[in-house]
Curated annotation (Swiss-Prot):
This is Thrombospondin-type laminin G domain and EAR repeat-containing protein. PROSITE patterns: EAR. EAR repeats lie at residues 313-358, 360-408, 412-460, 464-506, 514-570, 574-622, 625-668. Disulfide bonds: none annotated. It comes from Homo sapiens (Human). InterPro entries: ConA-like_dom_sf (IPR013320), EAR (IPR009039), EPTP (IPR005492), TSPN-like_N (IPR048287). Keywords: Cell projection, Deafness, Disease variant, Ectodermal dysplasia, Glycoprotein, Hearing, Non-syndromic deafness, Repeat, Secreted, Signal. PANTHER family: THROMBOSPONDIN-TYPE LAMININ G DOMAIN AND EAR REPEAT-CONTAINING (PTHR15261), THROMBOSPONDIN-TYPE LAMININ G DOMAIN AND EAR REPEAT-CONTAINING PROTEIN (PTHR15261:SF4). The lineage of its organism: Eukaryota, Metazoa, Chordata, Craniata, Vertebrata.
Amino acid sequence: MSALLSLCFVLPLAAPGHGTQGWEPCTDLRPLDILAEVVPSDGATSGIRIVQVHGARGLQLSVAAPRTMSFPASRIFSQCDLFPEEFSIVVTLRVPNLPPKRNEYLLTVVAEESDLLLLGLRLSPAQLHFLFLREDTAGAWQTRVSFRSPALVDGRWHTLVLAVSAGVFSLTTDCGLPVDIMADVPFPATLSVKGARFFVGSRRRAKGLFMGLVRQLVLLPGSDATPRLCPSRNAPLAVLSIPRVLQALTGKPEDNEVLKYPYETNIRVTLGPQPPCTEVEDAQFWFDASRKGLYLCVGNEWVSVLAAKERLDYVEEHQNLSTNSETLGIEVFRIPQVGLFVATANRKATSAVYKWTEEKFVSYQNIPTHQAQAWRHFTIGKKIFLAVANFEPDEKGQEFSVIYKWSHRKLKFTPYQSIATHSARDWEAFEVDGEHFLAVANHREGDNHNIDSVIYKWNPATRLFEANQTIATSGAYDWEFFSVGPYSFLVVANTFNGTSTKVHSHLYIRLLGSFQLFQSFPTFGAADWEVFQIGERIFLAVANSHSYDVEMQVQNDSYVINSVIYELNVTAQAFVKFQDILTCSALDWEFFSVGEDYFLVVANSFDGRTFSVNSIIYRWQGYEGFVAVHSLPTVGCRDWEAFSTTAGAYLIYSSAKEPLSRVLRLRTR
């Protein structure tokens, strides 16, 4: 498995002829400004406009004229027709948003006659793809190297350096640490560009046109451009070469217009709640007093120009939420056009749904359950569901967990489907390639903890979930689904095998239509997994609750043990231990962010003597890892959820020892 790489082969394609001579410098070994080739120095080209955002100027392309931004490859490949085997491409771009499943081309080299894509750089919401044509005796194949890059689609400027050397592909973003990929298929040594054409921001047609801003697009033959750019005081706007028209101020004053200094320019600033941002408000400012931020209307979107950075200052109690009984799990979710809700999984015969009203949760609906352990909210198309994991059998002695469906007419959840489970602890809902799944964590059947947990698949024909795959588990407590690039993973928290809590929890990867074992972790009464991402780094945290073996005498300190954070190591193709954190019978991790800071809060439930133990908030400190910053008094803490409203950010936790859940407000400064 290569977490950040997918190599895709398509059916053999007819390829243009290529030279048979050895490689020689077909271009000058200097930075070749691709943008300057298509934009005159005065900027007078139809089909593009110059836009300034965050103090920097970029080009915005028009759907009407993709061919305008193109030129023949022979213009820069003057000596021969071979693309260099070693090179780097530098791009400075701004992408405000990108709809799901949309792909936009930053650069392509296309054979004029056959319309073959010889080389391309393509952006999707979560990945940057480098495409090239590879030939052998069987024909020609298009190959794709994909880098995970969700941080690019944030409305800010970023400078990327893609360096290629045979089978090694490297991507550096904003002078950060490079992401290297060792590909099975190297870049070809003899890629002919005879009769080809460079296209900026498109693949020769309107479909896939790059709709963001591009400021820099440079090809550097023969070497990696990173040392020329980095380090930089302003890494997102590091410059190797940009067109003159983007360096100087654009536009000329009218004959009767007097040039003003910037501080004398008349601008319109709107105060109050967020106003509309349309063509009418284009280039106007809005000051948000509540967030202390200044925003500029650009292309139907308010772009932050100046904003105070939020930092977590302290945590204060906001609401004591009385529940029907002790609460074993909580689920916060939103229903469009209806509001924000929290579902509580209560120990006794009734669980509840609460609605956020006037800055607090109020009772909305009671639902009969049987020692409910967890709720899971999910959607399929326009359908909204809520699944409960029941731990005990019903009045007839039958064990069922129930899926409820939201009624848009009644504005309530109504029973939809019952599924036979065995002391269910958790549901996990996920989607893979457009198909919907539910995984149940079956904890035990009678006294037997070594039983199968089940993955169910939605059948669009019957509109029901049907058993799709069984996985052997040992006292399963939690499932967690996540994706890395094109790969889908499912990790289970195994708690007890009948004799010991020292059992392995397993990570599964989906291959050929089913989940297969990928990696095993030594765990101690594992109760929860939490996956999260910081920048390009992917982490997996396990909550260890108890170190116990039937052959050993119970000790109080067996609850005070390390929980572990693992980090994905792409080279090793595995998660490796990143940090140990001492916890007290930890039952849950919750990851959240405030401004530019990242946090983890742990649900500490028992220290061997008392259930009144502090749960801890940890802040990400870079190379130091997570460091404790806040201590929160809790009683039998079982579950944490983070959520936000227009009024601010909050945490809510459930107690397994008292009929009270608490809502905490995160105060920022």
